[in-house]
Structures are given as structure tokens and as C-alpha cells.
Amino acid sequence: MKIIEKFADEVINSGAYEPLDRVYVINKIRALVGDHDEEEENDQPAAKQLVDLAVKNEKIPDDITSREVLNDQLYDLATPTPSKTNSIFWQKMQKSSEENTDWFYKLCEDNNYVKKEAIAKNVVFSGTSSKGHSLEITINLSKPEKDPKAIAAAAHATGKKYPQCALCLENEGYLGGYGKNARSNLRIIRMNIAGRPWGFQYSPYAYFNEHCIFLDQKHIPMVINQQTLINLVEIEKIFPHYFVGSNADLPIVGGSMLAHEHYQGGRHTFPMMKAGIKKNIMFDSYPKVVAGIVDWPMSDLRLTSDNSLDLIDLGSKIIKFWDNYSDTARDIKAYEGETRHHTVTPIMHREGKNFVLDLVLRDNNTSEKYPLGIFHPHKQLWHIKKENIGLIEVMGRAILPGRLKSELEEVKKYWLGEDNKMAASHKEWADQVKAENEISLDNVDQVMEQSLVEVFEQVLQDAGVFKNNADGEEGWDKFITALTKEIK
């Protein structure tokens, strides 16, 4: 069968068009890839073959961006319009929230918005650190390399951006181009969260199962306050099978998109969610809320209750108290003049009827010794992880840069005494690991995985405000004493 005809059949079978529309669909495809058609010759998806055909027909230049833009234009044909997508989604919602997210996620996989093939390239494994914490490690290989033309375009970009950012509603159906994300096949579910219009979409390069984004339809900065907790509860009521959380709203400890209010969620049980309570806390005015300090490398207070109003009220008071709490002996400073340094990373999930809220305490102070952040991965870890510790990593899933896949292969050669091109930045760590282990061809992969787990444990320890040692426990006690005195 000819490639154009095959893809036209796929478009019609998707339900986006009717059989009567076949000639129309074929002409839409021809407008994108050229009139010359060919017999399919391999097992590659028809859309991918059509992109190759478009290059051959000189409809597009042969570069990463042009291929990506055309790919998404083709899959847009196989995707219901935004209004139809929303209509189907909310019809299914009447039966089951799981059924409608199953349907929407499959749609986003089938139309290649969720890059399933690229995501499968990621390195993923888990392990238990010497401190007893279960952790997950990923090396991110799914995002495509930067197109040189896109880099140049971004460097020379002037004037007002459209869309204003990568999370704005205006991305839905946006063609994209050099320096701009292709989003022809993006669909966003419209929803109401606590009286405000929000959107719900999936992440194209997912870091975990059904990785989704909830975004304010208005381009406003991120903020963590009582409204945040209200919003998280509202989302959990709609999607109880998903967790939802927010990155912190300050630089260094926050995510990379502070300019647009949004949350992340999905269907994944992170290590932090499975971690137990190491010390219970009593709040007399909140008998329906079970509270405690979580046994975790970062500083996490957990609140659990089937009464969401109590949870929101107590959680908001804890956030406000932390925002103004200082312990200068431990470099914990709430303010420097008018500059706020404290916030939290709030994360919520459901356990039956209970709402479980984790409030991870964050501090973005810097010092001469730690210019990138006192509570940020320290310099000896930068060869593995230098980037900010955001929501996903807070919960125990490392997102490590793609460069490490090849670099760590060279480290393994070094351990085995083979010729290698190991980066100098890894040498001190590699020597330490080698001195502590009998490394052979049989166990070198296991040693590498365990060593990365230990590095990630230390990354999280560095980001925690109260360390997992005697001094950290004293710091926790001092904080909890002051907190429970303030909140009866």
C-alpha cells in the first residue's frame, strides 16, 4: 500500500474523520508531504515514513525541527479537535475518572504527543541506599538534541513571545519552528479548579507513568499558599488515582518554569510516598489529622486526614510558620531584608478516603562556600547532578543528564583497568568507589547502579534543611517545639 493512503486510513480509523472524508484527508496529507507517493518499505510508523517522503519531495529541509513540526502536523490530522476531545473526556468522566484518563493518555500516545518511543530510551533502575531509603534513578535520554538552527533562532529572538511560555494555553495547536516547540497535536482538557479555569495535559517526555501537567489558563507566576492546598485537594477529588504536587515557588529550590502557575501529577507511587513516619507530631486543635516527620533524606512533614478542610487549614499554617522560621546556627534564614528564602514543595495523594499531604521544607539561601545554594547538591556531586532539585526528585526519582550514559561507560572501563576516556570530573568519585569495592566484569553494572543510588541519597541529604544526623534531629526538635507552640 502507498504510504499516504496507509496514513489516511489510520487517520479515519482514529475517529477524527469519517470514511466519506478520505479524499479530503489524502489531499491534506499531500499538501504537507508533496504529491509524489511511494510504497511503504519498512515497519516504521507511516507518519515517520511520510516525513522522510516530505524531505525527498523537498517539502521540508532535512533538519530536526522541520521533521518534528511536520510529524506533529500529520498526527494532528489523527486527533479529534480540542472541543471534541474535551466532550469525549467529560462524557467518560461520568463513568469513571480512571476510564477517562486511560482514554486521554492512549489518545496522546497514539497521536505521538507523548513520545513513547523516545521515552523508552531512558535508563531506569531502582535501589536501596546504605541509609535504608528506596530510590529510583533515571538517565534522561528521551529529549531530542538541540537543533543548531533552533539554538541560533533563540539567541536572536526579539519582541513579544507567542506563546508566552511552554505552558500557556496558546500552545494548543501551535505549529512551532526553530526555537519554538511543535504543538500541532497537543490537546488540553479544560477544567474548573476552585472557581478558576485550568487546563490538564500530558507531558510529551514523561519522567514517570502518565506524567501530567495541570496549568492555570492565565500566565501568572507560581505561588505556594493556602490556595495551592485547596487546588491540590480539588484535583485529588477529580483524579483520586493520581498524585499531584507543585514545585517550590523560589529560584534554586523550584522548577524551571516559575513564571506560570502549574502542578505536576500522574500515576506513579514514588519512594517518598512509601516512606514511613519516624516521629509523630500532635496538633491538639486538629484531632482528625495524623501528622509526623517522614523518614526521608529531605525534610518532610506529612499530614493525613479524611477531612480535607482540616488538612488545608493546618497545612497552610505550617507553610506560613516555615516561611518565617529561622535557625541561624544551621544556616536556616527565612528572610534577608525583604527577600524571602523559605517555601515548601507540597505533594498530595490519596490512600482510600484519606488525603495525604507531604510538605517538604525548602530554603534557597546561598553563601560564599555554597554559591549555588546551601541546601542544593554540593560541589563534589556536580559531576553527577548539578541541576535544581525539583518536585520529582524530592520524591525520590533522580533525573540525571543524558551525558552520563556514555560518561559512566568510561568510568566502568576505568574500574576494570581497560583503556578509557573517563572525564576528569569523575576521577575522585571513581577512585573512592574502586577503593571500597572488589569490581569485576560480573558486578561492575551492579556497583555502578548502587553507587548512583548513594550519590542521589547524598544529593537529597544536601537539599534537606534538617540533616539525618544528631544535629539535624536537634534542629527538627527545635522547629517542632516552636511550631506546636504556635499552632495549638
Swiss-Prot record:
Catalytic reaction annotation: alpha-D-galactose 1-phosphate + UDP-alpha-D-glucose = alpha-D-glucose 1-phosphate + UDP-alpha-D-galactose
Paired cysteines (S-S): none
Entries under Pfam families matching the protein: GalP_UDP_tr_C, GalP_UDP_transf
Residues spanning the membrane: none
GO molecular function: UDP-glucose:hexose-1-phosphate uridylyltransferase activity
InterPro entries (UniProt xref): GalP_uridyl_Trfase_II, GalP_uridyl_Trfase_II_CS, GalP_Utransf_C, GalP_Utransf_N
An individual GO BP term: galactose metabolic process
Protein keywords: Carbohydrate metabolism, Cytoplasm, Galactose metabolism, Nucleotidyltransferase, Transferase
Pathway stated in the Swiss-Prot or TrEMBL entry: Carbohydrate metabolism; galactose metabolism
Cellular compartments annotated: Cytoplasm
Keyword Transport in record: no
Known EC number: 2.7.7.12
PANTHER family reported in the protein's UniProt record: DUF4922 DOMAIN-CONTAINING PROTEIN, GALACTOSE-1-PHOSPHATE URIDYLYLTRANSFERASE
Listed name of the protein: Galactose-1-phosphate uridylyltransferase
Annotated organism of origin: Lactobacillus helveticus (Lactobacillus suntoryeus)
Taxonomic lineage: Bacteria, Bacillati, Bacillota, Bacilli, Lactobacillales
